[in-house]
């Protein structure tokens, strides 16, 4: 029997009692396991979020009232990147003249011909489109765009509030590569 205050023969030799080192490691691993699991879950969530916002959706804040009444200044938009935009869709795109993000509505695609008459009438392929816009569509003063415009694979975009909009009447056809996505959801920030 060992006397109090004296080291046992096992501890004098420097070797711990059988299994104590393994037991301490195992206990430490069990103690750290929830933290490691949480870190792995957070890393997976961060990777998923990065992939989602890189390849699937785009978030955009609407600036100005060019798309009024559909969108208002300050609305937060979710745009879906994987869908091909069609006539009538509201889209987020990068403006060819400034590179800024903007929102407008697709009125013509691919090889359509767009004409805006001096009286404020929009014609696509010589027909009046079925859009529910309340504002007259007039050419923008000072624009270098001449009508009719024949598209070469891109899209022609107009804002819903045609008197305030800075759209394809200013910078012409927008290449499809500049389309960032179709607006699929709107969060209204006003009145919150």
Describe each model-derived feature in a short phrase:
Residues 2-33, 55, 61, 69-192:
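Soluble "head" domains of membrane/secretory-pathway proteins
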Residues 37-55:
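Hydrophobic membrane-insertion alpha-helices, especially the h-region
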């Amino acid at each position: 029997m060992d006397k109090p205050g004296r080291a046992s023969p096992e501890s004098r030799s420097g070797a711990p009692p059988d299994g104590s080192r393994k037991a301490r490691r195992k206990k430490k691993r069990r103690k750290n396991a929830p933290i490691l699991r949480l870190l792995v879950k957070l890393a997976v969530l961060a990777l998923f979020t990065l992939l989602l916002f890189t390849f699937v959706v785009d978030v955009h804040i609407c600036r100005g009232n060019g798309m009024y009444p559909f969108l208002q200044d300050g609305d937060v938009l979710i745009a879906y990147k994987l869908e091909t935009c069609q006539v009538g869709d509201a889209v987020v795109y990068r403006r060819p003249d400034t590179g800024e993000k903007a929102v407008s509505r697709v009125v013509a695609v691919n090889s359509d011909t767009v004409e805006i008459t001096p009286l404020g009438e929009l014609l696509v392929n010589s027909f009046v489109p079925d859009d529910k816009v309340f504002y007259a569509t007039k050419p923008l003063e000072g624009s270098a765009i001449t009508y009719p415009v024949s598209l070469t694979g891109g899209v022609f975009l107009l804002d819903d509030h045609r008197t305030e909009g800075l759209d394809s009447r200013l910078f012409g056809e927008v290449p499809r590569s500049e389309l960032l996505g179709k607006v699929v959801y709107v969060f209204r920030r006003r009145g919150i």
